[in-house]
Amino acid sequence: PQGRPVMFLHGGPGAGCSPAHRRLFDPERYNILLFDQRGCGRSTPSADIEHNTTWDLVADIERLRTEVLHADRMAVFGGSWGSTLALAYAETHPDRVRALIVRGIFLLRQAELRWFYQEGASWLFPDLWEDYLAPIPEAERDDLMAAYRRRLTGDDPQAQLQAAHAWTQWESHTISLLPNPAHHRAHAAAQAALAFARIENHSFVNRGF
């Protein structure tokens, strides 16, 4: 607790933190806070998308800084979606950021989302793309994120889980060029897959609010 305060912001949104994330920091030097963002990881209620926007999360970070870390300033570390959130926090509260570390930078641009979820990455992983398309009828494939949203937020639990697993497996298998079983297992459980897919899709369809 006497170390330099640092807050770790995970990816997704919806991925949650893992014990491995602690290994990024020397516990002899840093007071480390791993923050499971709203609706995912150990946060409750799970898979909840109400009051779950970028700016709700920025407010959560600021509250954790004051009420948990008790720090005037802190380092903020984020990768992928975590980099988006870290940048949003740093722009909103620049005087509270001692250091900003971002990797795998993702800026939530329309071109990035379209490349990964509509057309682009599909050319690199054609076999996995077929699995991603499977829950969506051809008539709805002109806007895949919107089609997934209808299923992830619909009233049919079976359709929700089918969509959640397809969305999650697409991302976990394509997040690196070489297979990584740890990524594949991270959201294999039904509730973890639903939380990840619903929250991520919710954010992306709404362009991060």
Q: Can you say where each PLM-predicted feature lies in the sequence?
A:
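An accessory alpha-helical subdomain
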Residues: 137-178
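A catalytic-pocket lid/entrance helix-loop region that shapes and gates access to the active site
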Residues: 95-148
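Conserved acidic catalytic loop of the alpha/beta-hydrolase fold
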Residues: 55-74
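Conserved G/P- and acidic residue-centered "switch" motifs that form tight phosphate/ATP-binding loops
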Residues: 39, 78, 82
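Short glycine-enriched nucleophile-adjacent loop
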Residues: 83-94, 100
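Alpha/beta-hydrolase fold catalytic core
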Residues: 164-209
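Short beta-strand immediately N-terminal to the catalytic nucleophile in serine-hydrolase-like folds
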Residues: 76-78, 103
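Conserved HGGG/HGGXW glycine-rich cap/lid loop of the alpha/beta-hydrolase fold
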Residues: 2-45
